[in-house]
Amino acid sequence: ENVVAPAELPTDMNALKSQQFRWNKGGAETAKKIGLRVINAELPLRIKLHAVAHLFNTTNYIFILITAILSVPLLFIKNQVIDFNYFKYASIFLMGSIAIAYAYYISTLQREKTMRKTLSVYITRFPIFLAITMGMSLHNAWAVFRGWLGQQTAFVRTPKFNIVNGKDIWKNKKYTASKISPIVYLEGLFSLYFLSGIIMGFYYEDYGLLPFHMLAFSGFALIFYFSLKHSKLNS
């Protein structure tokens, strides 16, 4: 963890998407190719579990997307169907969220060193991370799905422009993408979909899913907005 490798992060939303598509599709293809071999290998259980979790971690985006889509009709069912009390048992699944939150807290603590700085950075950035992760779930789930289907796609490199300070320019470069993918418009529709979930929560005065729907709405809206904005800047 102390080995530093200088690298340039994606400078625009379309560059980030091309990187994420390549990583997630490649991860799914790798899991498809050697997943069963790892499961059947004569390895200690802890190593096998670690390997399987690492190989199949890209499928998380599929489950994030499915969970998000189902959350809106579930809110309606919860408030319209009589004696539908199964939701009180669903809180056990929050354990997964606690594990993720703790993992990112520890990584922030290792970087920031002091508790005060860690809490300041963590409280402001972790919700943004969750929102962006949810907003990218449609795009990344599509990449994973195509990887599992074995569909061949072109290898699209992440654009690099040697951006080292705020004065460097990445806009209108030939290497940047200007074409708008149909998925972008779906992301815009999903932002409206989760906005309806927020409105429904206030209508029913049921705020249990409100933070989840607010993160989903914010994430999809941000991804949609910056995908369009950066495409127009590069056209």
Residue ranges: model-predicted function:
Residues 1, 12, 141, 179-182:
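Alpha-helix initiation/capping motif
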Residues 1-99:
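Extended catalytic-interface subdomain
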Residues 7-26, 118-123, 127, 152-170:
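Nucleotide-sugar-dependent glycosyltransferase catalytic core
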Residues 11, 36, 114-115, 121, ...:
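General secondary-structure edge motif
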Residues 40-63, 163-195:
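Loop-to-transmembrane boundary segments
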Residues 57-154, 160, 181-235:
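Membrane-embedded multi-pass helical conduit in multi-pass membrane proteins
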